[in-house]
């Protein structure tokens, strides 16, 4: 009688801690990118005022959103064909060039050149913000929420660290003979160039290897045939996920941009308005280490339902006439966006062909939200804007009904 050899047990999936040692260049590059946008694009309206075009102060933000919407699908295709490292590296290089153009245009008083730089930096955002999919693909499915949460935490750390470098930027501005809002574009260009170096050091781990199964070494972070865009959209829950992501982005950007103006009209000082923005950023990014594991543990429906409820609360409390009410609105607005963004990213990590188009639609929603939201507020008042935002906040509940997992 012969005894069949015992098959060796399959290797255990690697832990997140072991995988994080390979993800640090990706995380650090995202922190650098967030720091770059903190010192550049956020102050674009001030640069336009310096250039004598205060009536067009919102144009750079619109160009940034539109450029990101137009580029996201193209970067998604590039990453599918050539891999995450090449796609993200190209985005960081493009962003660095955009920062240099923006600095040159602002310093020499060339408004078209400055706007070209803003558009270039916006197009880069359409690419490098897809780093979240790379992070999710690099770890096993049960800890993808955690991987995404860490990425969000690194984003807010990058923003906060750069805020602390204000005195150094002021000193550099003095040596260059420019304002801080102009020098920020040069600093941002340098940070994005450094992010490109970080991505060059990154060695993506194939998805199958991240899950603990054998795979060939490639830069695609995927193995086997990938579903096409049509096949991805036909899968249950994908279209509703894209709709939820776009709605959350539109609601977040619109209610983030317009309440500070309303707070100013209420008589709040700049310090109080800055506190509103800080509370919003904390809600967006600071709780990633909590919300990511919660989504892993409680499921995708939890993320969509809780995110939708928080967006509804944000819309409802945004009409308040008190600072406390506005602070609550801005905070839960950020936290609701956090939950929906993490959940949507976890879903779309299984459908690479849909990632670029999803981000394009989200950026387009943000651009339309700020443009049409301002017109609606001027014509019908802020309550009408809040009501519209509340209606859009219902889309995540559709995604919760359709999603699997």
Residues covered by each model-derived region:
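Helix-loop boundary and gating motifs at the non-cytosolic
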Residues: 13-69, 239-244, 253-263, 269
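Hydrophobic core of transmembrane alpha-helices in multi-pass small-molecule transporters
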Residues: 31, 111-126, 325-339
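Intracellular juxtamembrane helix-capping segments at the cytosolic ends
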Residues: 44, 126-139, 338-352
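Helix-to-loop junctions at the C-terminal end of transmembrane segments
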Residues: 71-84, 286-300, 377
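C-terminal ends and interior cores of transmembrane alpha-helices
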Residues: 93-108, 310-321
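C-terminal membrane-cytosol helix-exit motif in multi-pass small-molecule transporters
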Residues: 166-167, 171, 189-214, 399-403
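C-terminal transmembrane helical hairpin of 12-TM major facilitator-type secondary transporters
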Residues: 295, 301-344
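A late C-terminal transmembrane helix in Major Facilitator Superfamily
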Residues: 351-380
